[in-house]
């Protein structure tokens, strides 16, 4: 009886883990109206950018939120990145959840311990990169 219980528990956990791994996610789940600043550190040139204009924030948030991502692999000790992005609320606090990530390309991000690939659509990477260059400190 105990053995069946543990086998059943292991099966349920394994199925749950598979569902979690293959489920697509959306990044930048903060409401654009609540966002006060988007901070981008450009790994290509070492410059920091702060985006505070409401229209620019809304466009960036829309392009980020429009794409769903699937986990592809563990990030491990991967070196290098393009646009390290953090979203801050108007209160000055860092937004929680999927609001701190690295944009590597129009269809690839790193968030937490995983790399993700776009499952539909792409990020307007060129717009975000250009905006980060225009707002460099």
Please give the residue ranges for each predicted region.
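Short, structured surface segments that line ligand/substrate-binding pockets
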Residues: 69-108
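Positively charged n-region of N-terminal signal peptides that target proteins for export
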Residues: 1-4
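Short, solvent-exposed coil/turn segments at beta-strand boundaries
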Residues: 34, 55-56, 102-111
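Short, flexible beta-strand-to-coil junctions
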Residues: 41-45, 88-92, 115
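Hydrophobic membrane-insertion alpha-helices, especially the h-region
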Residues: 6-23
């Amino acid at each position: 009886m105990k053995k069946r219980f543990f086998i059943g528990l292991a099966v349920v956990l394994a199925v749950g883990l598979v569902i979690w791994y293959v489920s697509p996610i959306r990044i930048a789940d903060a409401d654009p109206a609540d966002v006060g600043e988007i901070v981008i550190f450009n790994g290509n040139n070492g410059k920091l950018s702060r985006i505070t204009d409401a229209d620019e924030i809304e466009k960036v948030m829309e392009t980020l939120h429009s794409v769903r991502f699937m986990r592809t692999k563990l990030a491990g000790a991967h070196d290098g990145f393009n646009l390290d992005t953090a979203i801050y609320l108007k209160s000055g606090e860092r937004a929680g959840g999927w609001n701190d990530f690295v944009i590597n390309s129009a269809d690839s991000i790193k968030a937490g311990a995983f790399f993700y690939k776009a499952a539909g659509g792409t990020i307007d990477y060129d717009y975000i990169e250009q905006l980060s260059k225009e707002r460099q400190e």
